[in-house]
Amino acid sequence: MKFEPILPEATINTVTRAELIGAFSYALDITEGQPAGHCLHACWIGSHIGRALGLSPQDREDLYYTLLLKDLGCSSNAARICELYEADDRAFKQGYKTVGTGLAATIHFIASRTAKAASFPRRVGVIGHILKNGDKIAQELIVARCTRGADIARTLQFPDAVSNGIYHLDEHWDGSGRPDHLRGDAIPLASRIALLAQVADVFHTHAGRNAAIDELKRRSANWLDPVLVKAFESVATDEQFWIGLKSPFLEQRVLALAPTENAREVDDDYLDDIAGAFGKVIDAKSHFTAGHSARVADLAGRIGASMGILPSRRRWLYRAALLHDIGKLGVSNSVLDKPGPLNEREWVIMREHAAHTQAILGRVGVLADMAPIAAAHHERIDGSGYPLGLKDDQIRRETRIITVCDYFDALSSDRPYRGAMSRSETLAIIESNVGTAIDGDCYEALRLNL
């Protein structure tokens, strides 16, 4: 996964909230198993509908961020999907979005995707449980996703219109949606547009322009607001709309649609908020990693101070530590939460998370220095680490700090294949890796800062 930075000359004083949120939306795409740029596509589609409807500048701004952040809570139900359906959560989510609205299509999808690796009796039992408890399961999964997404949006200081837009993404026009079974105009307009934009992009990506239009028509007046479907049909007559949707410069085109009346430049405090918010998205992927990013960042900050790193640079270290595992959003929970050793294929998938971290954080120039620090936390002093096999002085001091903090927290926390180790056991293991995986000075700083 490789993306070119869109702001090579950006500084903390010139980057806007729209630019940063647009870049981080790629992390949400990979969590949902969607192609890179899905949230940007949805923003392009939905923003054009908003303009066609003549929305006010404030309503267009709220819609814009609802579209980019519609999947902000998506990591919170990944582990549960994997557990319930005994399936790759990312592949399951991706496939489910292309399923028709009828009950027969849903049953066929569940039967074909659930517990595929299990024995026949086990598979029948799992499928039977899901079909018997389908309504309860669907409510649980969507409430988790919507509640988490809305909560994180509030921590990013977005207004209620945005958090409510995210919360009600899965409501349907006919009242059959979730989490609150709202009907018609009771559903926030931003939610109605976001759902339409999501369906349009998924089917356009999957099967082309005509398939997207046909699917929206099929879902009109059941899933989707018929007025919005008509608005989309009008927008879709403009060939430039489709050219823009497929443009390799879609990031810049979507950025140009961002309302400028209340454009917010990002200062250091807000960048901290964004890093903290996406740290929560990362940690929600698995209950085994709950709080991991925040603990690693806190410990890295203390060690950085004790090792004489200047406060301004230490702030970047803290952000890098918060986001070091953002690439794990692109790894299935069937791998992350496996209760036994990973096989060779699974190790390849797991190791890819470091490259994903580099790709996501490297999209924006203001994060360019931080990206390799975060992405290299599995490199080893002896050169046997990944993703690049760096060694010795090729590994920056900030990365070495994150590495030892990550190692400490991983060993001292519960994992799917073992329980948490005691502090003495953890330190003994880390000490045994000094000089091969772990920097000796960083180990001593860790020991003194616990």
Describe each PLM feature range.
Residues F3-L450:
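Metal-dependent catalytic cores of enzymes that make or break cyclic nucleotides
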